[in-house]
């Protein structure tokens, strides 16, 4: 299994590279990598605008540069999926840092080809994609969206309810980062 960490965004709302913001003296991106590492054989971090800066702090993952990062998040999903072809995947944005182990274990115990965690009826990350789905995903045009791809494969989707608010907590703004630092233990 391959963990794909999406780190190709521009952090427009945060106005700084949010993935390099530190909690417990570690950049957020490192927390995300450490969250999924125990469950995968390798981690692929898909970078974009902040490639050089991220390369300086990522030591325990393969790095793939998405030359199309300005085309949006799905372009990074595609870059990661191409690097993971032939493998099952755990897909997670780089700013979702503190998903608990039980949530990931629940995803891995599921039975369908696409497994999405849900907390109080709201879906989140990471998303599990079976290798058969990854093979279909890489055929999608770069203008697509992951939610549209998943909708086309609705009969293969399993929503797995978890008791984990962190599946939905991403850091989009400095206020989110401050909330993470204050309220959440990493």
Predicted regions and their residues:
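N-terminal nucleotide-binding beta1-loop-alpha1 segment
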Residues: 1-16, 154
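Structural beta-sheet core signal
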Residues: 3-5, 44-45, 90-91
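Cofactor-binding loop segments of dinucleotide-utilizing enzymes, especially the Rossmann-like FAD-
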Residues: 6-8, 48, 94
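Short, well-formed alpha-helical segments that are part of the catalytic scaffolds
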Residues: 18-19, 23-36
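Conserved N-terminal catalytic core of the sugar/cofactor nucleotidyltransferase
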Residues: 30-88, 101-102, 150
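Conserved beta-loop-beta/alpha segment of the NTase-like Rossmann-fold superfamily
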Residues: 70-135
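Conserved alpha/beta core of the MobA/IspD/sugar-nucleotide pyrophosphorylase nucleotidyltransferase superfamily
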Residues: 141-186
